[in-house]
């Protein structure tokens, strides 16, 4: 049995949250970063007359042991740090020195602009060039 580490952020949602909850509840891994998006209800959008639309939920997921539903709340990490610092926190916790951790983070760290729906740019991690 080996513990594994999962990095998460407020952009982790939907199926990723199912995975996060399983990791957390099984005790097989450790979650680092920010609380996830809280997006676990699923359904579809319907266009209505006069420019209106609605979302029709057709299902929800929940923790079968506790009946807990994380819609709108998200799955909290075991170690709460800003998402940009999650890898550094994992490396520190497994005994990697600060200088080596910074080098590793620089090698696999990345930025890739994305946009929030209706909002401004957001910086998320992406592979470093080269």
Where are these regions (language model features)?
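C-terminal "post-core" interaction segments
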Residues: 1-130
């Amino acid at each position: 049995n080996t513990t594994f580490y999962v990095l998460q952020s407020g952009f982790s949602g939907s199926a990723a949250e199912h995975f996060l909850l399983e990791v957390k509840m099984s005790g097989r891994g450790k979650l680092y970063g920010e609380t996830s998006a809280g997006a676990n209800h699923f359904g579809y959008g319907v266009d209505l007359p006069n420019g209106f639309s609605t979302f029709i939920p057709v299902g929800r997921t929940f923790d079968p042991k506790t009946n807990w539903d994380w819609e709108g709340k998200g799955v909290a990490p075991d170690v709460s740090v800003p998402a940009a610092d999650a890898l550094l926190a994992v490396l520190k916790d497994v005994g990697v020195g600060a200088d080596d951790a910074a080098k590793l983070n620089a090698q696999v760290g990345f930025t890739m602009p994305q946009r929030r729906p209706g909002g401004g740019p957001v910086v998320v991690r992406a592979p470093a060039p080269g």
